[in-house]
């Protein structure tokens, strides 16, 4: 196997992984669980300091197993019930009694949450205390990337900040393009990528859960009611939108099921998976073709998102759905050129969508971008594409660079304004 392909597989395995609950509050739960383990005893007070972006994405989303919202319950639950060895599934096992103890700690004023100024987009510092004992755990650059651990003021672990690598730079130094991703997905031995089929299983279960039970805004269930009433049809477009949104409904509503995430986002893992799976079912392709399409979708999304920070004012579901649309063209028997058309079309359609925090309405944004993915892949199959208009260049690689430039240079102040509005 080509060394370049092994790099691609390593990247996918590093950032396409199960995550239980929205990853920003889960980062705080994980840090708190590690701090508790370091302390050696359940703390009687917890202080949490986070970056603005992590704060933004934790304000309105339910923490799995708790039925509650926010960083305070995430940190308290992590300290009381979290498994420090479980990463993003830190809260996979939690009892009602433990939730009650976590809430009691909050009610007693023993859990504080503060925003802190930092250049890092993903930053969380948890200080857990018990009597005169104190444990500090700092996460920096990635949701489970521990940068420092201290016990009673003494350093027990630290990472040189110059060596720490944030998730946003994961493709740095790697020879990767949309074309190389497309060829890799087509040609790599099936056995090497079979693991990606777990994404279909995990995110499919979330979708089923969102359709079966009332979570969040019930976007998926609302569409199902519309189909049953004869208002809308159950075609591929509506089925993709319905089932993708349902998975997001469940995730944002605190369902106790993991999502297969993509670069730290469960919703984007869902958006990279479910439309591709349903398209594969529509075209009755083999399991191998599905795996190749999922690899194309997930790695394509990772590559595009590596051009800008991991958390920003930009809703990443847009570019994730662009990568999914590329994979959908592949499943339909389209060409590489048409796959590029699909990416261009989705980005042209939905690139104005902002991120105003993780919450129930994220399911609506997931449905919007997934709908764009379907329209765009159908247009691409007819060789209709946006080219040389607005931020869309004539070349897909240039378009991707334009997106990165727009977010890095043009949306920083937007992010600050959104956070100020949400915090007012």
UniProtKB/Swiss-Prot annotation:
What InterPro entries does the database record attribute to this sequence? Ser_deHydtase-like_asu, UPF0597
Q: Name one GO biological process term.
A: L-cysteine catabolic process to pyruvate
> What molecular function does GO assign, one term?
L-cysteine desulfhydrase activity
Q: Which Pfam families match?
A: SDH_alpha (PF03313)
Q: Which family does it belong to?
A: Belongs to the UPF0597 family.
Specify the protein name: UPF0597 protein Sbal223_1296
């Amino acid at each position: 196997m080509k060394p370049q392909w092994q790099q691609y597989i390593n990247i996918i395995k590093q950032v396409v992984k199960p995550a239980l609950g929205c990853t920003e509050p889960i980062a705080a739960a994980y840090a708190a669980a590690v701090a508790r383990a370091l302390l050696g005893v359940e703390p009687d007070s917890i202080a949490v300091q986070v970056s603005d972006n992590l704060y933004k994405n934790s304000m309105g989303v339910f923490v799995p197993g708790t039925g509650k919202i926010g960083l305070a319950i995430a940190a308290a639950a992590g300290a009381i019930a979290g498994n420090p060895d479980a990463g993003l599934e830190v809260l996979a096992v939690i009892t009602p009694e433990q939730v009650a103890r976590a809430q009691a700690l909050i009610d007693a004023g023993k859990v504080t949450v503060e925003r802190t100024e930092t250049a890092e987009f993903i930053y969380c510092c948890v200080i857990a205390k018990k009597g005169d004992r104190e444990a500090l755990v700092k996460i920096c650059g990635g949701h489970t990337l521990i940068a420092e651990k201290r016990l009673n003021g003494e350093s027990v672990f630290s990472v040189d900040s110059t060596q720490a690598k944030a998730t946003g730079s994961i493709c740095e130094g790697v020879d990767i393009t949309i074309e190389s991703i497309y060829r890799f997905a087509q040609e790599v031995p099936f056995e090497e990528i079979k693991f990606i089929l777990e994404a279909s299983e995990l995110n499919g279960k979330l979708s089923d859960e969102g359709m079966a039970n009332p979570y969040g805004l019930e976007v998926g269930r609302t569409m199902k009611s519309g189909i049953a009433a004869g208002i809308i049809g159950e075609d591929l477009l509506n089925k993709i939108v319905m089932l993708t949104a349902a998975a997001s409904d469940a995730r944002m509503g605190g369902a106790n099921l993991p999502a297969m995430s993509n670069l730290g986002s469960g919703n984007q893992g869902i958006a990279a998976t479910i439309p591709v799976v349903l398209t594969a079912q529509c075209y009755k392709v083999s399991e191998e073709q599905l795996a190749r399409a999922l690899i194309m979708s997930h790695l394509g999304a990772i590559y595009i998102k590596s051009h800008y920070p991991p958390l920003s004012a930009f809703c990443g579901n847009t570019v994730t759905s662009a990568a999914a649309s590329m994979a959908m063209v592949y499943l339909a028997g389209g060409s590489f050129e048409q796959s590029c058309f699909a990416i261009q079309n989705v980005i042209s359609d939905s690139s104005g969508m902002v991120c105003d925090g993780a919450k129930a309405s994220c399911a609506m944004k997931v449905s919007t971008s997934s709908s764009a993915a379907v329209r765009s892949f159908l247009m691409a199959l007819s060789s209709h594409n946006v080219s040389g208009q607005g931020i869309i260049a004539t070349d897909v690689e240039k378009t991707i660079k334009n997106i990165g430039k727009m977010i890095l240079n043009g949306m920083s102040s937007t992010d600050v304004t959104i956070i100020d509005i949400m915090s007012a």
